[in-house]
Amino acid sequence: MKTLILAAGLGKRMNSKYPKVIHKILGKPMINWVIDTAKSFGEVGVVLGHKHEMVEKVIPQDVKIFLQNEQLGTAHAVMCGFDFIPEKDNLLILYGDVPFISYETLKRLEKEHIESNSDVTILTAILENPAGYGRIVRGKKIEIVEDKDADEKIKKIKEINTGIYIFKGKFLKENIKKIKNDNAQKEYYLTDILKFTENISTVTTDDIDEVTGVNDRIQLSKLEKNMRKRINEKLMREGVRIIDPESVYIDITVKIGKDTIIYPFTFIEGETEIGEDCVIGPMTRIKDSKIGNNVNVIRSEVEKAIIEDNVSVGPFSRLREGTHLKSNVKIGNFVETKKSVIGKNTKAQHLTYLGDATIGENVNIGAGTITCNYDGVKKHPTIIEDGAFIGSNNSLVAPVKIGKNAITGAGSTITEDVPENSLGLGRARQVVIKDWVLRKKGGNQNADSKE
């Protein structure tokens, strides 16, 4: 079965310079939710219109694209993809702004369509407040009556048309061009194709979220909240502990291992993988990173980093792109790393910047250490070998190498390589001037300062 996704609408109520269908929901463009589901059934095509170039950049390359330059209704959109309609197979119609339609529901729809041998199978839903929706009217044949055309009796019907259909390709091809635009809007409505057949069946879903469209940012937020709840509940059923699901935001693309604990106000985004027995949060953001087992990340930000097993990060740490922490590393408060590999059992506990650095195993980085990696034109590397001890308040001016088991004195500015097993000092010698304060104040240690 092929799928044609209609996604050419203007999306005016979003009040955005971006097409509606590329707005992200839990890390994934809205239309890609639909495409990923549709791909389970076969080949996928999309009908685009408004700012189609932007949409084309986010959808997979194997999706066929058709353009609807003028938005003249749903039937007109299908006509734009006329060549995509199969002659001997079925066609599923979906919408780029209805992101959460499920595979299971569509599979039921397909099963009913095949078993009933219908020309059209309609997905319906029951709404307590169906105002604004087309009603399913059951008589000698099934009809769809739009809300604006419904009398009081029909308006009491709670079964509505979701706009999702499966057509026999042959029937659709033979009749789509018969649809007229003799209505106030001068548009071609796909529902009008029902005039050409009595061979219609329906399937009803009781999950309203999966057939709810996004028209504005309020609906976008509501749908995202509902889906976030489902994602968090799925993770909890799989063995993840989420202390407060309502305050935790996890993208659909994230993977988390068993017995990991997620504390409140944590954001886990993109292609992130987290192992087992970790503690994440509170107040932590992790994006596009790979984290091993038994890792603690507390009140910190991690992006495009690799963290191996048994590592501790935070509080108030920032791991930037290219950071690789090997097992048993400790990164403490107010430490920032970027494009740095930090070896096993190494510690950087306080107030440190490590950029473009390669650091060995069992190294101690003293508080206040800075790798001075940028000379105003280009970045330079710092190398610190196994067992080195970097004193507090050090500036390591790259390019520079600290050898194996070498030590640098506290307060040093290191501008030259320090050989292994050596001590590097780069600071002014302390001078003590006795009784300087007394002489400065004319011999009166408690003299008041002049106003």
Swiss-Prot record:
Species of origin: Thermosipho africanus (strain TCF52B)
Coiled coil: none
EC number(s) on file: 2.7.7.23, 2.3.1.157
Free-text cofactor note: Binds 1 Mg(2+) ion per subunit.
Co-factor(s): Mg(2+)
TM segment ranges: none
Catalytic reactions of this protein: alpha-D-glucosamine 1-phosphate + acetyl-CoA = N-acetyl-alpha-D-glucosamine 1-phosphate + CoA + H(+); N-acetyl-alpha-D-glucosamine 1-phosphate + UTP + H(+) = UDP-N-acetyl-alpha-D-glucosamine + diphosphate
GO molecular function: glucosamine-1-phosphate N-acetyltransferase activity; magnesium ion binding; UDP-N-acetylglucosamine diphosphorylase activity
Residue numbers spanned by region Pyrophosphorylase: 1-217
Organism lineage: Bacteria, Thermotogati, Thermotogota, Thermotogae, Thermotogales
Name this protein carries in UniProt: Bifunctional protein GlmU
Disulfide bonds: none
Subcellular location: Cytoplasm
Region (N-acetyltransferase): 239-451
Gene Ontology BP term (one): peptidoglycan biosynthetic process
GO CC, alphabetical: cytoplasm; membrane
